[in-house]
Structures are given as structure tokens and as C-alpha cells.
């Protein structure tokens, strides 16, 4: 399950401006095996809306990327927050309250038996989910 920062970096891969390790990682995985959480889509939408308010040109470019690339690419591979995910997320909050968005992404991955792909390892470390950081050199 791709975290938001990874989806954003994938945009740079297309432009030839991504981190070299991330580019190498993307070449080593089958795109059909990559999923996003509905929470990741929400975070991307929030980011685009925020940029649109500040910079119309940049906002239009990001809107186009989201609607013409991200949403079609992950059509059928966007995992919802359903009852199982909500319940697993609640268990991640007790006894240690954590960021709800990250907990929902972690819970989504746990329920579906997947890893979280992220640069923000610390945000997911205590959830028990398998974490892959494509910014680090793969062994």
C-alpha cells in the first residue's frame, strides 16, 4: 500500500527527477501489485486543493496529474476504509494514540496482508505493519 509521499515521488519518476533509489525500486516491482488506500487519495486531493488556492498554474498541473494519471492508474486498486479496516485502526489507537490517517493506512495494509511503502518509517514503526522504504538502497 503506497503512502502519499511515494505516490508524489512517482510523479517525479515520470519527469526524470525522482530519487535514484525510488526509481530503481519502481523498476523492480510490478505496477499491478501496487495499491493505495482511499486515505492516500484523500491526502492527495487535500494537497491539490491547497495548492490550487495558492498557485493556480501549479494547482492546475497537479489537478491534471491526479485526475489523468493517479486516479486512472489506481482504478480498481484503491482499497476502501471498510469495517475491518476501521476496527483494526481502532486497535492501533489503544493504548497508544497515533495519527489517524497513518493508522488507517497501516490498518488497510494489515487487513489486506500488504506492506506499507513509505519514506515516513517512524509514522508506521509501532503498528506492526511491514514497511518498505524505497528511498533506502534495497538489499
Locate the predicted segments by residue.
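Short, well-structured N-terminal submotif of metal-dependent ribonuclease cores
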Residues: 1-36, 40, 50-67, 96, ...
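A generic structural signal for short hydrophobic patches within well-formed alpha-helices
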Residues: 7, 41-44, 86, 124
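Residues that scaffold the ATP/ADP-binding catalytic core of kinase and kinase-like folds
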Residues: 9-11, 47, 88-92, 127, ...
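Structured helix-beta-strand junction loops
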Residues: 29-32, 73, 112, 127
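Short, conserved active-site loop motifs that form the nucleotide-linked donor/cofactor pocket
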Residues: 34, 76-78, 129
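Conserved beta-strand termini and adjacent loop/short-helix elements that scaffold enzyme active sites
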Residues: 37-39, 81-83, 119, 132-134
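Active-site neighborhoods of divalent-metal-dependent phosphate/nucleic-acid chemistry enzymes
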Residues: 46-51, 59-60, 71-119
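Acidic, PIN/NYN-like endoribonuclease modules and their adjacent C-terminal/linker elements
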Residues: 106, 110-139
Amino acid at each position: 500500500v503506497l503512502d502519499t509521499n511515494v505516490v508524489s515521488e512517482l510523479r517525479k519518476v515520470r519527469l526524470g527527477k525522482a530519487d535514484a533509489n525510488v526509481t530503481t525500486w519502481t523498476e523492480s516491482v510490478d505496477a499491478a501489485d501496487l495499491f493505495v488506500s482511499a486515505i492516500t487519495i484523500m491526502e492527495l486531493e487535500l494537497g491539490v486543493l491547497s495548492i490550487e488556492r495558492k498557485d493556480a498554474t501549479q494547482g492546475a498541473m497537479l489537478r491534471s496529474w491526479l485526475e489523468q494519471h493517479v486516479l486512472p492508474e489506481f482504478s480498481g486498486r484503491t482499497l476502501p476504509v471498510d469495517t475491518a479496516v476501521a476496527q483494526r485502526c481502532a486497535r492501533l489507537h489503544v493504548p497508544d494514540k497515533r495519527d489517524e490517517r497513518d493508522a488507517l493506512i497501516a490498518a488497510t495494509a494489515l487487513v489486506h496482508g500488504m506492506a506499507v511503502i513509505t519514506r515516513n518509517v517512524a509514522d508506521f514503526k509501532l503498528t506492526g505493519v511491514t514497511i518498505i522504504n524505497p528511498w533506502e538502497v534495497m538489499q
